[in-house]
Amino acid sequence: MKDLTAKEEEIMRYFWDNGPLFVRQLVQMHPEPKPHFNTLSTYVRALEEKGFLSHESFGTTYRYFSLVGETDYKNQTLRQVVKKYFDNSYLSVVSSLIKEEALSVEEVRKLLDEVGESDTKKS
């Protein structure tokens, strides 16, 4: 899966949240100042080339839809971060979060409970 720029991720969120869209709908959904139609159209075509979107024809216009789900994208991005910055160790990720106080003791307990429940269901 290819990486997305921040703007491409922002555009994908519109598709993940709303389903299939025409570019003109995408323009309307953006807050002021609204981007130009051609600008969004260029981003949408780039997302299609990267394999994140596809389209169906409606006369002379296209309606675009997501090929990659938000959860799949998040999971893949997380795997890439863990591999690149934490030597592919999720333990290192959790340890770093605890050291930076971004993860509380209570949250660690909840994680351990979830892991325990998951192990119980697998048995």
Pin down the residues of each PLM region.
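Short beta-strand "wing" residues that participate in macromolecule-binding interfaces
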Residues: H55
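Amphipathic alpha-helical dimerization/coiled-coil segments
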Residues: Q76-T120
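Short, cationic-aromatic polyanion-contact patches
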Residues: L4-K7, F58-T77
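Short, locally clustered residues in the helix-turn-helix/winged-helix DNA-binding domain
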Residues: R13-G19, I98
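Pre-recognition alpha-helix immediately N-terminal to the DNA-recognition helix
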Residues: E9-Y14, S92
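Short acidic, hydrophobic short linear motifs in intrinsically disordered regions
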Residues: L21-M29
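Glycine-centered, phosphate/nucleic-acid-interacting loop/turn motifs that mediate DNA/RNA or nucleotide
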Residues: G51
